[in-house]
Amino acid sequence: MAAKTYDAGVKDYRSIYWEPQYQVKDSDILAVFKVVPQPGVSREEAAAAVAAESSTATWTTVWTDLLTDLDYYKGRAYAIEDVPGSDEAFYAFIAYPMDLFEEGSVVNVFTSLVGNVFGFKAVRALRLEDVRFPLWFVMTCPGAPHGMKVERDLLDKYGRPLLGCTIKPKLGLSAKNYGRAVYECLRGGLDFTKDDENVNSQPFLRWRDRFLFCQEAIEKAEAETGERKGHYMNVTAGTMEEIYERAEFAKEIGTPIIMSDYLTVGWSAHTSLSRWCRKNGMLLHVHRAMHAVMDRNPNHGINFRVLAKILRLMGGDHLHSGTVVGKLEGDREATIGWINLLRDRFIKADRSRGIFFDQDWGPQPGLFPVASGGIHVWHMPALVSIFGNDSVLQFGGGTLGHPWGNAAGACANRFALEACVQARNDGRNLEKEGKEILTKAAQTSPELRMAMETWKEVRFEFDTVDKLDVQHR
């Protein structure tokens, strides 16, 4: 029932939005925030303030509260937990009723969950750690245009991770030289090559020219190797009209896969492109450029596991998800948690991997996690062990930096991959026996032997900034 009286003044959030007795419903959208309150603000008041400001409340009581049933529509802070190792932060668990959100609109959900509340003065820092999307909401979102199984059937590639390479230097090449690099990598044994995230349509490399030279390279490499090949043609652009124009041209010339920078292009634009890909039989590779702006600070922002769930709802067939062993940020257990969220149909809550809620994806197909960023042949055993078959392992400098050229770099990576897959299938421990496995394989591959010699001293040993708030056993 709506309130029967109207009392003006600043709200006491705790009295309205803190409900520790609340029984969570299957239809609720659940969120867990890491909260650092301002000095003098109690945990219960801060948690209730987050629930209020991310749902129905404003800073004061208003007379129009009498015109609706606020008790039905409000978000509820229903639990508080300590954050391991922190004296200041705590976890606030909040439940939101289903009618607060537009069906199928990730944009609408997150306009509430990470909107004005993140600038709210009652908290010093706020981070969205996880979200449970109920099945009713999942079923209204497009999901992956095709998914892992359909992609494997289209490419006729089974039983191993897929291999890719980002063309370098990422900016500055002419279209003809860019296409030449694509051809050499694909001919050497890779499944895919890729535009980097900021390759759009610069004066030195207009998109139409790049698409044509890359497609020529794909067709030539396919004819020579007898394998299906592809290049992630980045259709990211400044307007939706330009995105569709580039996607349509890619379809017209016969390319199998295009690419989107889903965070910088915008969630509505990306969702529209994902729907287009499903209708037009086009695979969609997704880059996460800008993610670290939101997810790297351990106390403020949005955890990448939430960004990964958002992408799974909006749609993509591949998503960059860190490497654990390369140059980019990524705690091992957290990364494995992200991989599970992208690929599996149902994920159980697992705090050791940072997963707070069970998540049921229903019939939505899984997508390939992509390991990319500072990886080379010495990382291959660990990558195959961590990511398994259903993944894309993407070596940029680890292909193009080979002393003998791009084709040799691609050949070295393919040889290393197949050696690791065979060893794994034979029951060997890749992470313990990786050096021995690669050394033996290099006896019959001079390209691999040279790659191992080139990168034997290259390591990225910086500590991870965003670590899980749990002690691994």
From Swiss-Prot:
It catalyses: 2 (2R)-3-phosphoglycerate + 2 H(+) = D-ribulose 1,5-bisphosphate + CO2 + H2O; D-ribulose 1,5-bisphosphate + O2 = 2-phosphoglycolate + (2R)-3-phosphoglycerate + 2 H(+). InterPro entries: RuBisCO, RuBisCo_large_chain_AS, RuBisCO_lsu_C, RuBisCO_lsu_C_sf, RuBisCO_lsu_fd_N, RuBisCO_lsu_N_sf, RuBisCO_lsuI. The keyword Oxidoreductase applies. One of its GO terms (molecular function) is magnesium ion binding. Mg(2+) binds at residues 194, 196-197. The active site is at 168 (proton acceptor), 287 (proton acceptor). Heterohexadecamer of 8 large chains and 8 small chains. This is Ribulose bisphosphate carboxylase large chain 2. It comes from Cereibacter sphaeroides (strain ATCC 17025 / ATH 2.4.3). The gene is cbbL2.
